[in-house]
């Protein structure tokens, strides 16, 4: 009989722990963690006749609707002309650009984009808060394929621009060197040469 007063607090403690575990199990899983990777879902399948899909360098005409996860629309092109972008030129947020790769004309996709591939820690006040996950529904209206020479030119042009700086500096240095290495003619000699030329005339 002396053990029962000691067991009572232990029984109460076990009862509390067990009831807490039951309550957590009934509440279900904790709230979802924020989206960390790009999630792309096809809403309208590409036509079977699709032979060309979007690739880096191509020009795309797209209609889109961007929204926050709570459903608030942040931007849409449905009330105006389609947006024209060139893939690979960073004209839209990275997550949206990645979701457009391999898309066919007539296809429609939904992209759920984590903040680090969207507007990041700054957001885009006032419509997009910091660290916001955004969702874009995108339809590819038209695709203009970049030819081989256009792609080559666009990849080489920045390199040519970078190479021009040292080339120009080299030319300037060479010009200054040639100018400095010429024998200096005195002013007196120059005057004499001018007089001699004028006498000959």
Curated annotation (Swiss-Prot):
Would you say which domain of life the source belongs to? Eukaryota
- Assembly mode: Interacts with IFITM5.
The record's subcellular location field reads: Membrane
Q: Which organism is it from?
A: Mus musculus
What family, per the record? Belongs to the FKBP-type PPIase family.
Pfam families, per this entry?
Answer: FKBP_C (PF00254)
Which intervals hold domain PPIase FKBP-type?
57-144
The transmembrane residues are: 156-176
**Does this UniProt record's set of keywords contain Transmembrane helix?**
yes
Question: What is this protein called in UniProt?
Answer: Peptidyl-prolyl cis-trans isomerase FKBP11
* One GO molecular-function entry: peptidyl-prolyl cis-trans isomerase activity
Q: What is its main location?
A: membrane
